[in-house]
Each structure stands twice: as C-alpha cells, then as structure tokens.
Amino acid sequence: MAKNKKLFEYLSQHAETISSTWYETIEETDPNSIYASTDPVVIHNLKSQNLAFNYKINRIFIDDEDVYLPILKEWAFEVTQDQEHLKTPIHYIIREFVRVRDLYVSYVKEFVHLNQNTVKSEEAEDLYHALIKAFDLVIHIFIEEMYKNTSLQLQAQKDMITELSAPVIVLFHSVGLLPLIGDIDTVRAKLIMENTLHQCAKKKVTQLYIDLSGVAVIDTMVAHQLFSLIEALRLIGVSSTLSGIRPEIAQTAVQLGLSFEGISLRSTLASAIASDLKLKKV
C-alpha cells in the first residue's frame, strides 16, 4: 500500500469537510432509508459514523494493512449492528460508499495538484490505486458483516416461527398444552416433534394435552409422526392425552387402519382437563 504521511495529514484536516459535503449532497426520498431520516438522533449518529470512518480510512496512507484492516472491520461491525442501517436497502448503502469514495478521489487529486513538485505521476497513480483498493475492501467487509447479521436475524425469526407453530403452553404446575392448528405435513410434523420434546424438557412438563381440534386433515405419515411424538414424550417422562379429534380425522384414521390403542383420548380439551382434575381430587 502506498504511504504518504502528508496526504494522511491533508485528508485528516479535511475529514469534517468531506463528511459535511457528503451529508449535504445526499438525495434520498425512500422513507425506509437511513439517509432520508429527519430524526435528530439518527442524523447525529449517521454523521458521527461517517466522520469516524473518514478518520479510519485515512490511516491507509500511514499504516500497513494488518494494522488498519482490523480497525475498519471493527467500524463495519459496529455499523452493521445499527438498526437504522439494517432497515436500509443494501444498494443504498453501497451507493453512499461510492459517493464518499468519489469525494476522496477528488481530495487526493487536489492534494496531488498542490504537491505536483514532490508527488510524481507514478506515485499519484499508486495513491489512487491504494484508495480504491481500500474502499473495495471496506465495501466487501461491510457486505459480509451485513450478511452475517441478516442471517442471524433470519435464523432467530425462523426459530420463533418454529416455536410458535408448536407452542407448549404451561397451564398449571407441570401440566402443558400443545394446540395444533392448520395443515400438518411431514416437515411441520418433524418440527413439532423436535420443538415439543425440547419445550417439555425445558418447562418441566410431565403431562401434556395435545389438542387436534384445529386440524382438519391428517395422513398416515403425519399420524405415525404423532404416535412417535407420544412415544418419545413417554420416554422422557411425559404422559400425553389427545383431544379434539374431528370426525373427518376419525373417519380417515379408520379408513387408513390407524390405531389409537393405548393412547389417552378425550372428545374435547375441556373434558380432558376436567376429567384429570376430577381424578386428582379423588
């Protein structure tokens, strides 16, 4: 990387001007973009982040890559944690990186012009190349950090959806309820199995009501998954009761030759709970 302490000092002296010029020339109308915000706090943070970046990128002209690169990575990591940046489409952010880079190129050109007696054309080309390379590195780092952050958010959302698709609700003490609603295919049945076992163990549930009143259709594969769930629950010390089996499912079960032998059944969830409470009182 080309070194030039005088250029570093020149850019550092103009860092605030570069930042101000950049912000004042933003043209943004998309309300989803951080660059269109009118919130004073958001604006202040955005300006501070940009100015901090300017001071850090300037160091490419005095430091080796193994020194300045971790500093730029740390800046990129912090900015990609910012909710306002996370809400902003990535192509807007890249556009602003390019605008800042173009401003820097103009300042480097001005520096070369002011110091044409000492900065030769070959050295000037090296300085331009160093600047472009540094910005390319930062953009790459930023996109990578944004991808990591977005992936973590998507995984968290996926985990939440999975949990909500088969929520184990603690009714009282160690008694829980698993209300199943909607269509259940083999993929969802597998998620229900994994999530239910995990939640029962986590919430210390020893008795679980599995209510099927919201399920209209069930096939052989899903039924076997359901039976496997009940058996797996038994192995971890959880007794299960099926309730709310609709007539359509009962008819399908008979036609498919499915057996509910050995499984505790109740017509409704209310009757299942009432029956168990009555037995406990006796």
UniProtKB/Swiss-Prot annotation:
Record Pfam families: STAS
Role summary: One of 4 functionally non-identical RsbR paralogs, it functions in the environmental signaling branch of the general stress response. Negative regulator of sigma-B activity. Non-phosphorylated RsbS binds to RsbT, preventing its association with RsbU. Requires any one of RsbRA, RsbRB, RsbRC or RsbRD to sequester RsbT. When RsbS and the RsbR paralog(s) are phosphorylated, they release RsbT, which can then bind and activate RsbU.
Protein name per its UniProtKB record: RsbT co-antagonist protein RsbRC
Post-translational modification: Phosphorylated by RsbT.
Domain of life: Bacteria
Subunit structure: Probably present in the stressosome with RsbRA, RsbRB, RsbRD and RsbS.
Source organism of the structure: Bacillus subtilis (strain 168)
Mutant lacking the gene: phenotype: Cells lacking this gene have no visible phenotype in response to salt, ethanol or energy stress. However cells with multiple disruptions (RsbRA, RsbRB, RsbRC and RsbRD) have an increased basal level of sigma-B, indicating this protein is a negative regulator of sigma-B.
Domain STAS: 165-276
Residues with PTM Phosphoserine: S165, S174
InterPro entries the record matches: Bact_StressResp_Reg, STAS_dom, STAS_dom_sf
Phosphothreonine sites (modified residues): T186
Keyword list, A-Z: Phosphoprotein
